[in-house]
């Protein structure tokens, strides 16, 4: 089984207590993107990243000085969003790290796909960024089926804990032989499941931690997830969508 998650916009390099074990599989493609981003004028980069001047300035400097083969941090410790805070890899036990290195993959607009212990540097480039160059129409076009092929080399089961922005990179390439399951985390209101961004991110992080703690290898075991008030709802789910409803919000 492979579990896919999204990256986070915010990054840090404070994971010095663990070292990278690998280089990203598509490092050369990341270098090509870096060269292009490095060539952009500041204002053009700011528009591409859709951010304020402070963040644009930080990332303009990053791309100008970036050394993708130099000092790096393990990807799982480099991202600093809500999902990663609730996953809390900083306090993982060794066997949890072994589990996620085998089963977890982080999708990235810049690196394509990452193992947890791939060495990365801070960057900002969302998959949906309107990057149009002489070699691609956008990042979905740039990555084509690269991410999907890497993801399905060894496994035919994919658990989707990523946002639509990132899961879109593989969904168009799915074949009949792939068991693809999406997790939905929401509140039940008037018979409909309503997802709230913050709660979804929290639950995705908790789900990864839950799976690592239990060393889950079978999809059926995922249904036992019961953290943050979420419970699996059989009647709302099907073979390709596992729905978890926040119990306290049911009406």
From Swiss-Prot:
Pfam families referenced in this protein's UniProt entry, alphabetically: H2O2_YaaD
InterPro entries the record matches: YaaA
GO cellular component, one term: cytosol
Source organism, top-level taxon: Bacteria
One example of a Gene Ontology biological process annotation: response to hydroperoxide
HAMAP family xref list: UPF0246
Stated family: Belongs to the UPF0246 family.
Protein name, entry field: UPF0246 protein DSY0297
Lineage per the UniProt record: Bacteria, Bacillati, Bacillota, Clostridia, Eubacteriales
